[in-house]
Amino acid sequence: MAENSEGLGTVPEHERILQEIESTDTACVGPTLRSVYDDQPNAHKKFMEKLDACIRNHDKEIEKMCNFHHQGFVDAITELLKVRTDAEKLKVQVTDTNRRFQDAGKEVIIQTEDIIRCRIQQRNITTVVENLQYAFPVLEMYSKLKEQMTAKRYYSALKTMEQLENVYFPRVSQYRFCQLMIENLPKLREDIKEISMSDLKDFLESIRKHSDKIGETAMKQAQQQKTFSVALQKQNNVKFGKNMYINDRIPEERKENELKQGFEEEDENEEEILTVQDLVDFSPVYRCLHIYSVLGDEETFENYYRKQRKKQARLVLQPQSNMHETVDGYRRYFTQIVGFFVVEDHILHVTQGLVTRAYTDELWNMALSKIIAVLRAHSSYCTDPDLVLELKNLIVIFADTLQGYGFPVNRLFDLLFEIRDQYNETLLKKWAGVFRDIFEEDNYSPIPIVNEEEYKAVISKFPFQDPDFEKQSFPKKFPMSQSVPHIYIQVKEFIYASLKFSESLHRSSTEIDDMLRKSTNLLLTRTLSSCLLNLIRKPHIGLTELVQIIINTTHLEQACKYLEDFITNITNISQETVHTTRLYGLSTFKDARHAAEGEIYTKLNQKIDEFVQLADYDWTMSEPDGRASGYLMDLINFLRSIFQVFTHLPGKVAQTACMSACQHLSTSLMQMLLDSELKQISMGAVQQFNLDVIQCELFASSEPVPGFQGDTLQLAFIDLRQLLDLFMVWDWSTYLADYGQPASKYLRVNPNTALTLLEKMKDTSKKNNIFAQFRKNDRDKQKLIETVVKQLRSLVNGMSQHT
């Protein structure tokens, strides 16, 4: 049983080995067979038995397979026997085909002979080509030269000529066609020189026409660059908290009519920045320069180019006669010059030797002298400050543009200081008209206000500070008239306008502050002062207006310190800075006020004269009317009303005006008595005249203007009083006895005055008392008068001898 079980276990293993032998590559059978012998003893016998059994099985399968395919094999043999017949037929056909090929080969032999003859001809042609191989490149190069000439590729044509002369012509120089080509080359070179020179002339004419466009583009780019730099500086100043007035001097609402007006027609959208190469085709210059360089005549080309450009420079620098009339004339002049030198700068940097730095510097110095002379001459015709300002802005952009190209422009900025003085003069003329208009429109009455809004509106224009005035209830009146805030505003406008010119001059804040203060001083001391004086002297300006003018000048004088603070704020320069110029407004308004005071005195006296001219005395009346004359009472009432207006004036001014008026009235009354055309005066007329003088004395004693001490004002009439008392009392003995004594009762009576009046009364006595000589009293009075007249004459003669 054990053997059986062992045998049963071995059989599957042998089957596995057999399957592995059948399915494994022959090279790997060794290990498999070795495993047969590694097993139990006699295992290989069993394996051999198993192998024999497997072989028998395969033989049986092969036999079955052969039996299955035998009929097919028999059929194939039968078919093969049938093909033999067809093979014999095929042999006959192949033989026939071979015969026909032999017949056809005869024609091929003939064609082959023809080919041999062609080969011989080809060899001959090759020999000829080999002999002409040196001639064909010459012809090709010459043909290329013609094509280059036709295509206007002259520089390449010249290079081709050099190759022909140096490389190709020596190889075929023995041929006649080569000699003809050699003779034709100089003519071609001359043609190239003429054509290139013609192109250069066209180029020069083109850039002359397009210089203004080139210059306009360059100036616009310079302005954009400057605007960017200023904006960047503003940003930095804001970041570090610096004062912004110098870089942003004018408020936003005041920035119209700036330099951008010259280029505002351009599209402000983002666009490609054009360069001089985009606007001008410089290829003619390059070609001509290269051509003349190749021809060895570069110096001739350089001399011609520089000569022609100098001629164009003189034409560009020649301005139009009416250039000073509009800013466009100046702009066109500047853009042409900029365009010219931008082109020269480009030529300087892209070519070698055509123009040099020394040449451009010489050309620029010549041009700069001419430009300065032209601007100095034409700017002198400008009377519009806006035009002068636009000219300044153009000069600044012009200078900045050329400075960016390396040209020195310091002399242009020096010229701007000359133009600045002219600009200030035009501003002064303009503001003279502004001041005149303000004075013409003023009503010369205090500014009325009825509410807080109106009060703030005035305060916002003029720095008025008065605590007492602020405490007053509405409605109330400012002491000054409308012209004061208007003038103050216009002075600030003038400072703004003057500041506009100072921008972009590359000057320090201290220099700008000094310029502003000097120009403002000129405005105050010359323009405003002149306008005030002319206003004061106008015939239609009355006493009320003059009083208001004095009040106005007082407030304007007080506002000068605010103007100084205003300048300090916009320049950021402290008033305590050394060498800071002060404003002379104080002296200006003081002078104007003194002139107005003098005019008040003059007009007041003129008004008194007008009233005095209305006097209509009856110098022969026997008795007085018993009341003062009507003209005099009207005059006194007028003086009272006028002196009430004077209450707003400084005390000394009102007192001086009042004293001057009383003295002038006293003098006018005295002159009326002593008038040479008045021949006779009666005692009744003297008494009536005395009534008028009494009214004058009463007026003086009523203190029409406060501030007089005692009877100071009455002393204005002391001469008249003593004279009239002398004649009214007829106190000649006392006068003659005390004459010359300091304590004399009639110290103010001049003997000559008394003599003149006494003679007028003497003549009246004679005329009215023809028969009075028969009365004793009248005779005694007449003798007394004659005696007094003699004594007075002796006093007068003594005074004249003493004198």
Swiss-Prot record:
Q: Which domain of life is it from?
A: Eukaryota
Q: Which GO terms describe its cellular component?
A: exocyst; Flemming body; growth cone; perinuclear region of cytoplasm
From its record, what is one biological process in GO terms?
exocytosis
Q: Identify the main location.
A: cytoplasm
* Record's subcellular location: Cytoplasm; Cytoplasm, Perinuclear region; Cell projection, Growth cone; Midbody, Midbody ring
Keyword annotations: Cell projection, Cytoplasm, Exocytosis, Protein transport, Transport
What function does the entry list? Component of the exocyst complex involved in the docking of exocytic vesicles with fusion sites on the plasma membrane. Together with RAB11A, RAB3IP, RAB8A, PARD3, PRKCI, ANXA2, CDC42 and DNMBP promotes transcytosis of PODXL to the apical membrane initiation sites (AMIS), apical surface formation and lumenogenesis.
Query: Quaternary arrangement and interactors, per the entry?
Result: The exocyst complex is composed of EXOC1, EXOC2, EXOC3, EXOC4, EXOC5, EXOC6, EXOC7 and EXOC8. Interacts with CNTRL. Interacts with RAB11A in a GTP-dependent manner.
Which family, according to the similarity comment? Belongs to the SEC15 family.
Q: What is this protein called?
A: Exocyst complex component 6
Organism listed in the record: Canis lupus familiaris
* Chain's gene name: EXOC6
